[in-house]
Amino acid sequence: MQGSVTEFLKPHLVNIEQVSSTHAKVTLEPLERGFGHTLGNALRRILLSSMPGCAVTEVEIDGVLHEYSSKEGVQEDILEVLLNLKGLAVKVSGKDDIILTLNKSGIGPVTAADITHDGDVEIVNPHHVICHLTDKDASISMRIRVQRGRGYVPASARVHSQDEDRPIGRLLVDARFSPVDRIAYNVESARVEQRTDLDKLIIEMETNGTIDPEEAIRRAATILAEQLDAFVDLRDVRQPEVKEEKPEFDPILLRPVDDLELTVRSHNCLKAETIHYICDLVQRTEVELLKTPNLGKKSLTEIKDVLASRGLSLGMRLENWPPASIAED
Protein backbone atom coordinates (compact mmCIF):
# COMPACT_ATOMS: atom_id res chain seq x y z
CA MET A 1 0.00 0.00 0.00
CA GLN A 2 1.81 3.04 -1.28
CA GLY A 3 0.74 6.63 -0.79
CA SER A 4 1.47 9.90 0.86
CA VAL A 5 1.88 9.90 4.62
CA THR A 6 -0.72 12.65 4.76
CA GLU A 7 -3.40 10.55 3.08
CA PHE A 8 -6.08 9.01 5.28
CA LEU A 9 -7.53 5.58 4.75
CA LYS A 10 -11.24 5.51 4.08
CA PRO A 11 -13.22 2.71 5.73
CA HIS A 12 -15.64 0.54 3.84
CA LEU A 13 -18.46 -1.69 5.03
CA VAL A 14 -16.90 -5.10 5.53
CA ASN A 15 -19.61 -7.20 7.07
CA ILE A 16 -23.12 -7.09 8.49
CA GLU A 17 -23.78 -10.07 10.73
CA GLN A 18 -27.50 -10.45 11.35
CA VAL A 19 -27.68 -12.17 14.73
CA SER A 20 -31.48 -11.93 14.80
CA SER A 21 -34.21 -9.79 13.29
CA THR A 22 -33.45 -7.04 15.81
CA HIS A 23 -29.78 -7.69 16.58
CA ALA A 24 -26.84 -7.10 14.24
CA LYS A 25 -23.10 -6.51 14.20
CA VAL A 26 -21.63 -4.05 11.72
CA THR A 27 -17.89 -4.04 11.02
CA LEU A 28 -16.02 -1.10 9.47
CA GLU A 29 -12.34 -1.23 8.49
CA PRO A 30 -9.67 -0.09 7.94
CA LEU A 31 -9.51 3.06 10.02
CA GLU A 32 -6.53 5.17 10.96
CA ARG A 33 -5.34 4.62 14.52
CA GLY A 34 -7.66 6.41 16.95
CA PHE A 35 -10.48 6.91 14.46
CA GLY A 36 -12.22 3.77 15.68
CA HIS A 37 -13.02 5.37 19.03
CA THR A 38 -13.65 8.79 17.47
CA LEU A 39 -16.26 7.51 15.01
CA GLY A 40 -17.59 4.77 17.26
CA ASN A 41 -18.42 7.11 20.12
CA ALA A 42 -19.98 9.73 17.82
CA LEU A 43 -22.14 7.16 16.01
CA ARG A 44 -23.15 5.53 19.28
CA ARG A 45 -24.40 8.82 20.72
CA ILE A 46 -26.33 9.69 17.56
CA LEU A 47 -27.88 6.23 17.28
CA LEU A 48 -29.11 6.39 20.88
CA SER A 49 -30.34 9.97 21.02
CA SER A 50 -31.08 11.33 17.56
CA MET A 51 -32.64 8.62 15.42
CA PRO A 52 -36.21 9.38 14.29
CA GLY A 53 -39.00 6.93 15.00
CA CYS A 54 -42.57 6.51 16.23
CA ALA A 55 -43.77 6.13 19.80
CA VAL A 56 -46.94 6.12 21.90
CA THR A 57 -47.45 9.60 23.38
CA GLU A 58 -51.05 9.61 24.70
CA VAL A 59 -53.62 7.02 25.76
CA GLU A 60 -57.33 7.21 26.59
CA ILE A 61 -58.81 4.18 28.39
CA ASP A 62 -62.57 3.99 28.87
CA GLY A 63 -63.45 4.28 32.55
CA VAL A 64 -60.01 5.55 33.58
CA LEU A 65 -59.52 9.15 34.70
CA HIS A 66 -55.88 9.09 35.78
CA GLU A 67 -52.83 6.85 35.71
CA TYR A 68 -52.86 6.18 39.47
CA SER A 69 -55.89 3.93 39.28
CA SER A 70 -56.92 0.43 38.35
CA LYS A 71 -59.59 -1.02 36.12
CA GLU A 72 -61.94 -3.78 37.15
CA GLY A 73 -61.16 -7.04 35.40
CA VAL A 74 -57.64 -5.98 34.40
CA GLN A 75 -54.79 -7.71 36.21
CA GLU A 76 -52.30 -4.84 35.85
CA ASP A 77 -52.76 -1.37 37.28
CA ILE A 78 -52.91 1.53 34.83
CA LEU A 79 -49.29 2.57 35.36
CA GLU A 80 -48.17 -0.91 34.30
CA VAL A 81 -50.47 -0.82 31.27
CA LEU A 82 -48.91 2.48 30.19
CA LEU A 83 -45.45 1.03 30.71
CA ASN A 84 -46.34 -1.91 28.48
CA LEU A 85 -47.70 0.42 25.80
CA LYS A 86 -44.32 2.14 25.67
CA GLY A 87 -42.94 -1.15 24.35
CA LEU A 88 -45.02 -1.05 21.16
CA ALA A 89 -42.86 -1.05 18.03
CA VAL A 90 -44.78 0.80 15.33
CA LYS A 91 -43.88 1.76 11.77
CA VAL A 92 -45.98 4.48 10.15
CA SER A 93 -45.83 5.48 6.49
CA GLY A 94 -46.61 9.02 5.36
CA LYS A 95 -48.09 10.31 8.63
CA ASP A 96 -46.65 12.01 11.71
CA ASP A 97 -49.64 11.61 14.01
CA ILE A 98 -52.16 8.72 14.12
CA ILE A 99 -54.76 7.27 16.49
CA LEU A 100 -54.94 3.50 17.02
CA THR A 101 -57.87 1.75 18.72
CA LEU A 102 -57.97 -1.36 20.88
CA ASN A 103 -61.10 -3.23 21.99
CA LYS A 104 -60.89 -6.58 23.76
CA SER A 105 -63.16 -8.58 26.06
CA GLY A 106 -63.04 -11.97 27.77
CA ILE A 107 -60.38 -13.75 29.80
CA GLY A 108 -56.86 -13.74 28.41
CA PRO A 109 -53.95 -11.55 27.40
CA VAL A 110 -54.40 -8.33 25.45
CA THR A 111 -51.62 -8.02 22.88
CA ALA A 112 -50.54 -5.58 20.21
CA ALA A 113 -52.24 -7.83 17.65
CA ASP A 114 -55.61 -6.72 19.08
CA ILE A 115 -54.96 -3.13 17.98
CA THR A 116 -57.00 -1.93 15.02
CA HIS A 117 -55.06 0.02 12.40
CA ASP A 118 -55.05 0.86 8.70
CA GLY A 119 -52.62 -0.08 5.94
CA ASP A 120 -50.23 2.79 6.70
CA VAL A 121 -49.35 1.24 10.07
CA GLU A 122 -47.30 -1.86 10.83
CA ILE A 123 -46.96 -3.22 14.35
CA VAL A 124 -43.64 -5.02 14.38
CA ASN A 125 -44.18 -6.86 17.68
CA PRO A 126 -47.80 -8.09 17.53
CA HIS A 127 -47.22 -10.59 20.38
CA HIS A 128 -46.24 -7.82 22.81
CA VAL A 129 -48.50 -8.12 25.88
CA ILE A 130 -50.28 -4.95 26.99
CA CYS A 131 -52.36 -6.36 29.86
CA HIS A 132 -54.39 -9.38 31.00
CA LEU A 133 -58.16 -9.63 31.43
CA THR A 134 -59.10 -11.82 34.39
CA ASP A 135 -62.87 -12.11 34.05
CA LYS A 136 -65.11 -13.38 31.27
CA ASP A 137 -67.18 -10.22 31.49
CA ALA A 138 -64.15 -7.93 31.59
CA SER A 139 -63.36 -5.64 28.69
CA ILE A 140 -61.00 -2.84 27.81
CA SER A 141 -61.21 -0.13 25.18
CA MET A 142 -58.55 2.44 24.49
CA ARG A 143 -57.37 4.95 21.95
CA ILE A 144 -53.62 5.13 21.46
CA ARG A 145 -51.93 8.16 19.94
CA VAL A 146 -48.70 7.47 18.05
CA GLN A 147 -46.48 10.33 16.89
CA ARG A 148 -43.21 10.67 15.04
CA GLY A 149 -40.21 12.23 16.77
CA ARG A 150 -36.65 11.59 17.84
CA GLY A 151 -34.79 10.83 21.01
CA TYR A 152 -36.59 10.62 24.34
CA VAL A 153 -39.30 13.07 25.39
CA PRO A 154 -40.72 12.58 28.92
CA ALA A 155 -44.38 13.28 29.56
CA SER A 156 -43.40 16.01 32.02
CA ALA A 157 -41.90 17.99 29.13
CA ARG A 158 -45.29 18.13 27.41
CA VAL A 159 -47.69 18.37 30.34
CA HIS A 160 -47.45 22.16 30.80
CA SER A 161 -47.84 23.06 27.12
CA GLN A 162 -50.87 20.79 26.66
CA ASP A 163 -52.48 20.96 30.09
CA GLU A 164 -55.12 23.55 29.20
CA ASP A 165 -56.47 21.69 26.18
CA ARG A 166 -56.00 18.14 27.49
CA PRO A 167 -59.31 16.58 28.59
CA ILE A 168 -59.57 14.53 31.77
CA GLY A 169 -58.72 10.91 31.08
CA ARG A 170 -56.15 11.54 28.36
CA LEU A 171 -52.96 10.10 29.82
CA LEU A 172 -49.54 11.29 28.69
CA VAL A 173 -46.82 8.69 28.14
CA ASP A 174 -43.04 9.07 28.19
CA ALA A 175 -42.11 8.81 24.51
CA ARG A 176 -39.00 6.93 23.45
CA PHE A 177 -38.88 7.60 19.72
CA SER A 178 -35.46 6.09 19.06
CA PRO A 179 -35.74 2.68 17.35
CA VAL A 180 -32.34 1.68 18.79
CA ASP A 181 -32.66 -0.18 22.10
CA ARG A 182 -29.00 -0.90 22.78
CA ILE A 183 -25.71 -0.12 21.10
CA ALA A 184 -22.09 -0.82 21.92
CA TYR A 185 -18.88 -0.58 19.96
CA ASN A 186 -15.52 -2.24 20.14
CA VAL A 187 -12.23 -1.30 18.49
CA GLU A 188 -9.80 -4.01 17.43
CA SER A 189 -6.48 -3.93 15.62
CA ALA A 190 -6.53 -4.19 11.84
CA ARG A 191 -3.87 -4.75 9.22
CA VAL A 192 -3.54 -3.63 5.62
CA GLU A 193 -0.45 -4.96 3.83
CA GLN A 194 2.52 -3.80 5.91
CA ARG A 195 0.56 -1.47 8.17
CA THR A 196 -0.49 -2.96 11.48
CA ASP A 197 -1.37 0.22 13.37
CA LEU A 198 -4.93 0.45 12.07
CA ASP A 199 -8.35 0.16 13.73
CA LYS A 200 -11.33 -2.06 13.08
CA LEU A 201 -14.64 -0.70 14.36
CA ILE A 202 -17.30 -3.22 15.39
CA ILE A 203 -20.71 -1.77 16.19
CA GLU A 204 -23.23 -4.07 17.85
CA MET A 205 -26.80 -2.89 18.09
CA GLU A 206 -30.26 -4.04 19.00
CA THR A 207 -33.32 -2.28 17.60
CA ASN A 208 -37.06 -2.59 18.14
CA GLY A 209 -37.39 -3.99 14.63
CA THR A 210 -38.69 -0.84 12.94
CA ILE A 211 -35.36 -0.04 11.27
CA ASP A 212 -32.71 -2.10 9.51
CA PRO A 213 -29.28 -1.93 11.26
CA GLU A 214 -27.50 -0.94 8.05
CA GLU A 215 -30.03 1.83 7.44
CA ALA A 216 -29.58 3.00 11.03
CA ILE A 217 -25.82 3.32 10.53
CA ARG A 218 -26.38 5.19 7.27
CA ARG A 219 -28.78 7.66 8.88
CA ALA A 220 -26.49 8.26 11.85
CA ALA A 221 -23.52 8.88 9.54
CA THR A 222 -25.62 11.31 7.48
CA ILE A 223 -26.60 13.26 10.59
CA LEU A 224 -22.97 13.43 11.71
CA ALA A 225 -21.77 14.57 8.27
CA GLU A 226 -24.43 17.29 8.07
CA GLN A 227 -23.42 18.64 11.48
CA LEU A 228 -19.74 18.72 10.47
CA ASP A 229 -20.43 20.56 7.21
CA ALA A 230 -20.16 23.86 9.08
CA PHE A 231 -16.50 23.11 9.84
CA VAL A 232 -15.52 22.21 6.28
CA ASP A 233 -15.23 25.85 5.24
CA LEU A 234 -14.15 28.04 8.12
CA ARG A 235 -14.22 31.31 6.22
CA ASP A 236 -15.91 34.05 8.15
CA VAL A 237 -19.30 34.00 6.50
CA ARG A 238 -21.37 36.66 8.13
CA GLN A 239 -25.06 37.08 7.70
CA PRO A 240 -25.82 40.47 6.17
CA GLU A 241 -26.94 42.86 8.83
CA VAL A 242 -30.45 44.05 8.34
CA LYS A 243 -30.51 47.72 9.19
CA GLU A 244 -33.73 48.78 10.75
CA GLU A 245 -35.03 51.90 9.13
CA LYS A 246 -35.81 54.40 11.83
CA PRO A 247 -38.94 56.39 11.18
CA GLU A 248 -38.29 59.96 10.13
CA PHE A 249 -40.65 61.17 12.84
CA ASP A 250 -41.82 59.84 16.17
CA PRO A 251 -44.91 57.73 15.30
CA ILE A 252 -46.99 59.64 17.85
CA LEU A 253 -46.51 62.82 15.80
CA LEU A 254 -48.23 61.18 12.83
CA ARG A 255 -51.36 60.42 14.80
CA PRO A 256 -54.46 62.64 14.52
CA VAL A 257 -55.24 65.17 17.22
CA ASP A 258 -58.41 63.15 17.93
CA ASP A 259 -56.15 60.72 19.83
CA LEU A 260 -55.39 63.44 22.38
CA GLU A 261 -59.00 63.18 23.64
CA LEU A 262 -59.36 66.92 24.18
CA THR A 263 -62.58 68.58 25.23
CA VAL A 264 -65.07 69.36 22.48
CA ARG A 265 -64.32 73.09 22.68
CA SER A 266 -60.55 72.65 22.31
CA HIS A 267 -60.95 70.04 19.59
CA ASN A 268 -63.27 72.24 17.52
CA CYS A 269 -60.90 75.19 17.82
CA LEU A 270 -57.98 73.13 16.47
CA LYS A 271 -60.13 71.72 13.70
CA ALA A 272 -61.12 75.24 12.65
CA GLU A 273 -57.40 76.06 12.33
CA THR A 274 -56.88 72.94 10.10
CA ILE A 275 -54.68 71.33 12.74
CA HIS A 276 -55.29 67.66 11.94
CA TYR A 277 -52.14 65.93 13.20
CA ILE A 278 -50.31 66.13 16.52
CA CYS A 279 -47.22 67.25 14.61
CA ASP A 280 -49.17 70.24 13.28
CA LEU A 281 -50.10 71.14 16.83
CA VAL A 282 -46.67 70.90 18.48
CA GLN A 283 -45.19 73.27 15.88
CA ARG A 284 -47.57 76.03 16.99
CA THR A 285 -46.54 78.42 19.75
CA GLU A 286 -48.69 79.53 22.69
CA VAL A 287 -49.07 82.96 21.14
CA GLU A 288 -50.28 81.48 17.86
CA LEU A 289 -52.83 79.27 19.58
CA LEU A 290 -54.19 82.11 21.71
CA LYS A 291 -55.01 83.94 18.48
CA THR A 292 -57.35 81.08 17.58
CA PRO A 293 -61.00 82.17 17.91
CA ASN A 294 -62.76 80.78 21.03
CA LEU A 295 -59.54 79.19 22.38
CA GLY A 296 -58.76 80.71 25.76
CA LYS A 297 -56.14 80.16 28.43
CA LYS A 298 -58.11 77.26 29.94
CA SER A 299 -58.08 75.36 26.65
CA LEU A 300 -54.41 76.25 26.14
CA THR A 301 -53.52 74.83 29.55
CA GLU A 302 -55.44 71.65 28.73
CA ILE A 303 -53.54 71.23 25.44
CA LYS A 304 -50.16 71.81 27.12
CA ASP A 305 -50.92 69.27 29.86
CA VAL A 306 -52.05 66.60 27.39
CA LEU A 307 -48.93 67.09 25.25
CA ALA A 308 -46.65 67.01 28.29
CA SER A 309 -48.13 63.66 29.35
CA ARG A 310 -46.85 62.29 26.02
CA GLY A 311 -43.42 63.91 26.25
CA LEU A 312 -44.30 66.70 23.81
CA SER A 313 -44.66 70.46 24.01
CA LEU A 314 -45.69 73.46 21.96
CA GLY A 315 -43.17 75.37 19.86
CA MET A 316 -41.24 72.31 18.63
CA ARG A 317 -39.25 72.77 15.41
CA LEU A 318 -39.50 69.86 12.95
CA GLU A 319 -37.82 69.72 9.59
CA ASN A 320 -39.24 68.07 6.47
CA TRP A 321 -42.80 68.33 7.66
CA PRO A 322 -45.21 67.19 6.41
CA PRO A 323 -43.78 63.80 5.32
CA ALA A 324 -44.48 62.54 1.84
CA SER A 325 -46.95 59.90 3.07
CA ILE A 326 -49.19 62.59 4.57
CA ALA A 327 -48.61 65.13 1.85
CA GLU A 328 -49.80 62.62 -0.76
CA ASP A 329 -52.93 61.92 1.26
Curated annotation (Swiss-Prot):
Pfam family, one: RNA_pol_L
Any GO molecular function: DNA binding
Keywords: DNA-directed RNA polymerase, Nucleotidyltransferase, Transcription, Transferase
Alphabetical list of Gene3D superfamilies matching this protein: 5' to 3' exonuclease, C-terminal subdomain, DNA-directed RNA polymerase, insert domain, RNA polymerase, RBP11-like subunit
Segments of this protein annotated with the region Alpha C-terminal domain (alpha-CTD): 249-329
Domain of life: Bacteria
Catalytic activity: RNA(n) + a ribonucleoside 5'-triphosphate = RNA(n+1) + diphosphate
InterPro entries the UniProt entry points to: DNA-dir_RNA_pol_insert, DNA-dir_RNA_pol_RpoA/D/Rpb3, DNA-dir_RpoA, RBP11-like, RNAP_asu_C, RNApol_insert_sf
Region Alpha N-terminal domain (alpha-NTD), residue ranges: 1-235
GO biological process: DNA-templated transcription
EC number(s) on file: 2.7.7.6
GO cellular component labels: cytoplasm; DNA-directed RNA polymerase complex
Assembly, per entry: Homodimer. The RNAP catalytic core consists of 2 alpha, 1 beta, 1 beta' and 1 omega subunit. When a sigma factor is associated with the core the holoenzyme is formed, which can initiate transcription.
Functional summary from the UniProt entry: DNA-dependent RNA polymerase catalyzes the transcription of DNA into RNA using the four ribonucleoside triphosphates as substrates.
Comment on protein domains: The N-terminal domain is essential for RNAP assembly and basal transcription, whereas the C-terminal domain is involved in interaction with transcriptional regulators and with upstream promoter elements.
Stated family: Belongs to the RNA polymerase alpha chain family.
HAMAP family: RNApol_bact_RpoA
Protein name per UniProt: DNA-directed RNA polymerase subunit alpha
Underlying gene: rpoA
